[in-house]
Each structure stands twice: as structure tokens, then as C-alpha cells.
């Protein structure tokens, strides 16, 4: 029975390490884009556009504007 609990404890650790690995794999190329000034500017504009679009959408959905 102790091996059952040991195996059960391994699953959350596996999930966390797999999720962190996936995040690092996805964000790695994005951080390489920040080394070039033109790519960094384009990346900043895209992120700003997405965040401002999300803000406007939420404000309109919540009838704040």
C-alpha cells in the first residue's frame, strides 16, 4: 500500500513539471524575437493591441463605457 501513495504523489509533480516545460518551450522563441529591435517593436505592438482589445471588450461587456 505505501507504493500506491508514492505513485499517487508523483502525478501532481509530473503535471507541474510538464506544464512548466510546455510554457518554456512555447515562450523560448518569443524571447529570441526580443533580441532584434524590429521584432521587439512588432511584438510590443501586438501585445499592446491584444491587451487594449481585451480591455475594450470587457468594458463594453460590463457596460462601463
From Swiss-Prot:
**Which organism encodes this protein?**
Guillardia theta (Cryptophyte)
Q: Which Pfam families match?
A: DUF751 (PF05421)
UniProt key word Chloroplast: yes
Does Chloroplast appear among the keywords? Answer: yes
* Superkingdom per UniProt: Eukaryota
Q: Which InterPro entries match?
A: Uncharacterised_Ycf33 (IPR008470)
Recorded family membership = Belongs to the ycf33 family.
Could you give one GO CC term from the UniProt record?
chloroplast
Q: Which keywords does UniProt give here?
A: Chloroplast, Plastid
Subcellular location field? Plastid, Chloroplast
Record protein name field: Uncharacterized protein ycf33
Amino acid at each position: 500500500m505505501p507504493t500506491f501513495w508514492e505513485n499517487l504523489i508523483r502525478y501532481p509533480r509530473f503535471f507541474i513539471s510538464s506544464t512548466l516545460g510546455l510554457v518554456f518551450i512555447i515562450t523560448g522563441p518569443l524571447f529570441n524575437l526580443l533580441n532584434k529591435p524590429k521584432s521587439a517593436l512588432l511584438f510590443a505592438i501586438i501585445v499592446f493591441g491584444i491587451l487594449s482589445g481585451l480591455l475594450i471588450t470587457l468594458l463594453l461587456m460590463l457596460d462601463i463605457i
